[in-house]
């Protein structure tokens, strides 16, 4: 390459798709080739037809040394015009070392994909964090969250992706950094926050959500009360039903009824006095935990429990989602732990098998 350049080869040449020689060198990952081309006048800010720059390609392929060379010669304005940050590319390619380099260089971890890029993804993802979570890449997720990445920016919540994977560490990490446990899916919305549907068979995951302020009371909200529930011809979850489905309609489905007693018993640890509707009651009465559930429902809750609920309500869900706020409360450590339901934090206790 050096000989060709010395003989007059054009370092600014481009292929039919506008891919520059520098971009192809970045794709190969040879830092000496990248440096040589730059010395002969190659421009790091010339995009190919797709909008990608050499820095994007180096980040996507995980070529750390080439990336180091390209960072100082790439304009932020050119990156903004491209509609995608090299942060996205490093996260998508699962290259935490490249990601760390870019973060240290000052790239914005909350740069969102431009609409013209977003439309190529079925889920219309926007953030680099979403790419890292989708890959199950804990190292990259930790780097992004530590650098200030916001976990609630995408149409499909990052927490939803982690819950679907059943990845305890990923879910815990997102919750500690402010992931919203009370998000609602845009498709087939339920009457209660959507995250619960991924935890019905897993007590560890269920308590994670409840500890971080999941709106449990909505699960006991039913307009029918003690009256007979109207029959729905399209009862249950399907790809076509779009309605305000109540929790009682979900947990009483034939393939979930056996979980109802365990799920409701756990939920009662997070609410004041609640009333259960006739439909839910009829199913619970057939469960082994019914006597314990009935005792809780028909007796006053302890003052200690009520005080915990009141403190949590005064704190608000935003502070519960970010427990660092607890450090500002003039309360003894044991009381803080009680308010945060630490006795029910099974994951922190090292319990990693949550199937009922």
UniProtKB/Swiss-Prot annotation:
Pathway: Protein modification; protein ubiquitination. It is found in: Cytoplasm, Cytoskeleton, Cilium axoneme. ANK repeats lie at residues 17-46, 50-81, 82-111, 124-153, 154-183, 185-218. One of its GO terms (cellular component) is cilium. InterPro entries: Ankyrin_rpt, Ankyrin_rpt-contain_sf, SOCS_box, SOCS_box-like_dom_sf. The keyword Ion transport does not apply. Keywords: ANK repeat, ATP-binding, Cell projection, Cilium, Coiled coil, Cytoplasm, Cytoskeleton, Dynein, Microtubule, Motor protein, Nucleotide-binding, Repeat, Ubl conjugation pathway. Consists of at least two heavy chains and a number of intermediate and light chains. Force generating protein of respiratory cilia. Produces force towards the minus ends of microtubules. Dynein has ATPase activity; the force-producing power stroke is thought to occur on release of ADP. Involved in sperm motility; implicated in sperm flagellar assembly. Belongs to the dynein heavy chain family. Dynein heavy chains probably consist of an N-terminal stem (which binds cargo and interacts with other dynein components), and the head or motor domain. The motor contains six tandemly-linked AAA domains in the head, which form a ring. A stalk-like structure (formed by two of the coiled coil domains) protrudes between AAA 4 and AAA 5 and terminates in a microtubule-binding site. A seventh domain may also contribute to this ring; it is not clear whether the N-terminus or the C-terminus forms this extra domain. The SOCS box domain mediates the interaction with the Elongin BC complex, an adapter module in different E3 ubiquitin-protein ligase complexes. This is Dynein axonemal heavy chain 12. It comes from Bos taurus. The gene is DNAH12.
